[in-house]
Amino acid sequence: MTDNTWAPLCVYCSPINGDLLVGMMYESTSDSLNEGKIIRYNSTGQLTQTIQYDNTGRGLYRNVDYITENNNGDIVACDSDWKTGYAAVVVTERGGRHRFFYTGPPSGPRLRPHGICTDAFSHILVCDDRTHAVQMITKDGEFLRNLLIRPPGLLEPWSLSYDRNAHLLWVASWSGKTVSTYRYINRHLDFEG
């Protein structure tokens, strides 16, 4: 990567094909908004894709802070702009076509996303800095439930990873300075109560 105008903010290595996804930001020096994009490199280091705009030419991202790939190939990113208060989960299909924005549950406060991952059911799990919980949404952007609502030792969930073999959710806590594991799916791929 040799472009000096764009700064890499996050990286993700796809277990599907070994591609490297990089979340990028161009910080505007004027009063205009920051711009973001996701670029994809194949296993030989060749740039193969840039995802930046929706089908109307509107920018999809401002600051791509966290990125993951769902089982169906969708690219899932936490996007935010703390200057303006904008924050959302942005999902595109593998080819780059915009699918949806998720900004929080219908009856709750707006999401302030941080860490993000997906599980064996293709659910999207995202840390919410506003509620200090991990939100679970469907692969189509519908809110399912909150996980880990202020459990002991987890003061501010900040980063996530899902272990697909052991079905464990790894959660890093910013304020608690801990990394913890949680099981919410049993080994038979059912939800635990």
Annotate each PLM feature:
Residues 1-193:
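Eukaryotic scaffold repeat domains enriched in small/polar residues
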